[in-house]
């Protein structure tokens, strides 16, 4: 399977596989850039086209093994700027969208297929069926991989490592599952440390400590390093700089802890595959969208090896593991929270005022979602704040205050997301509470951009 990517096939530095792959009579599926690669390699032509991002209707034009059973039309997720102008000889068009006349092509005889859309994202209807058709029907593979099998394999691999493991836990499902897998494998050789970086949700440091002590029998301790992180972030506005500073400070905290409580040979992290893809360090030429504090390797001066048992999984798969490991539903259904914390939900410099606004406003958003029954139905929700201000009227007096942006999205794996259509009365209650309970806020807005083109977090 040739995946999508940011390159154009007519660029001199465009990534291509070894040419012999095209002459080995192997089933091939090209997705987005991979689709254009197949068109080019088999003698067709690719051209620069109008950019097409987001949802489109794919109309099925001809029968094929690839699109078998998907219906006459489906909603497909697009993210491209090139398209096939001429398809290769021996291929047929099996599907089109309004913006791409050859959105799906096939050579059933060669078992070679190209699709301009992304079947791997949840917003593409029947996307899983399309991938199943290729893997099972075209390639003849068997479905014998299970989450239970993954757990057994991971525990077996971890049990063979030597030395003690230091695991950074945040209270989120990713690092919690990592801690439980390692504990299952090596027991007392694991030490979990929670770092209060001053960028957490309201009362989170207390809630995380209680959660671990009440639910899990692992070695757990916490470190208060809030002042250290906030001091380093003073005057910093660039989002990438903030992310890198947070990542570096985590390493400094872990290093100091390891020197005092060690020896440790390993540092375990809850890195997932979307983190790796967005950081541009996956096995391929993915574009760097934003760095992640736990991705990219460790600095040379840190004498610890990295352990990332979940680095090839997505969030929905991690939640399945959590269920199998007996994690209470309340814990594994918590909304994802970024590693750099509120620093990436605060646009511009992290200041005490903006930090407090983000904490309190986000808590109000979560409370109202729980009250209305929407919390477990959405993927993620929070309130962001920047430097923009607007005039308001409070108690018949003019007030110049901050603008808060509410963000609520639906997703499965965080690779794509759609903004949630909340009832107006829920949004109204959020807005009223935020402006009434936070003196510095005068306006509340609701963000209605999907991913792509936006990202889930603002920075």
Could you describe each region identified by the protein language model?
Residues 8-12, 16-17, 22-24, 36, ...:
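RNA-binding accessory domains that recognize and position tRNA/RNA substrates
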Residues 29-35:
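Helix-terminus/capping and membrane-interface signal
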């Amino acid at each position: 399977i040739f995946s999508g990517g940011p390159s154009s096939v007519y660029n001199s530095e465009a990534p291509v596989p070894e040419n012999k792959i095209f002459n080995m009579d192997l089933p091939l599926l090209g997705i987005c850039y991979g689709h254009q690669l197949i068109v080019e390699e088999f003698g067709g032509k690719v051209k620069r086209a109008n950019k097409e991002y987001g949802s489109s209707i794919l109309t099925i034009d001809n029968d094929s093994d690839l699109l078998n059973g998907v219906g006459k039309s489906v909603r497909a997720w697009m993210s491209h700027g090139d398209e096939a102008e001429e398809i290769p000889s021996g291929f047929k068009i099996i599907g089109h969208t309004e913006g791409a006349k050859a959105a799906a092509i096939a050579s059933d005889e060669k078992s070679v297929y190209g699709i301009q859309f992304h079947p791997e994202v949840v917003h593409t209807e029947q996307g899983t069926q399309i991938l199943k058709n290729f893997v099972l029907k075209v390639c003849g593979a068997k479905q014998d991989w299970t989450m239970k099998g993954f757990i057994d394999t991971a525990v077996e691999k971890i049990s063979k490592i030597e030395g003690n493991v230091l695991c950074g836990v945040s209270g989120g499902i990713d690092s919690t599952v990592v801690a439980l897998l390692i504990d299952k494998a090596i027991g007392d050789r694991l030490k979990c440390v929670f770092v209060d970086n001053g960028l957490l949700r309201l009362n989170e440091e207390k809630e995380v400590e209680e959660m671990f002590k009440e639910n899990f029998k692992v070695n757990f301790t916490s470190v208060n390093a809030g002042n250290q992180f906030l001091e380093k972030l003073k005057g910093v506005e660039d989002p990438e700089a903030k992310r890198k500073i947070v990542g570096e400070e985590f390493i400094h905290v872990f290093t100091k802890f390891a020197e005092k409580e060690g020896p440790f040979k390993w540092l375990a992290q809850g890195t997932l595959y979307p983190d790796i893809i967005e950081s541009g360090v996956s096995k391929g030429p993915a574009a760097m969208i934003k760095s992640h504090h736990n991705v990219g390797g460790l600095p040379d001066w840190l004498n610890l090896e990295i352990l990332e048992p979940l680095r090839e999984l997505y969030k929905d798969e991690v939640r399945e593991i959590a269920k199998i490991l007996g994690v209470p539903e309340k814990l594994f259904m918590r909304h994802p929270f970024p590693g750099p914390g509120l620093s990436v939900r605060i646009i511009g410099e992290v200041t005490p005022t903006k930090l407090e606004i983000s904490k309190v406003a986000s808590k109000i958003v979560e409370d109202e979602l729980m009250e209305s029954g929407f919390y477990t139905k959405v993927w993620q929700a929070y309130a962001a704040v920047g430097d923009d201000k607007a005039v308001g009227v409070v108690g018949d007096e003019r007030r110049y205050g901050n603008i808060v942006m509410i963000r609520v999205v639906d997703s499965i794996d965080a690779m794509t997301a759609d903004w949630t259509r909340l009832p107006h009365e829920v949004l109204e209650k959020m807005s009223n509470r935020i402006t009434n309970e936070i003196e510095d806020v005068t306006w509340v807005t609701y963000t209605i951009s999907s991913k792509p083109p936006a990202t889930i977090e603002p920075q």
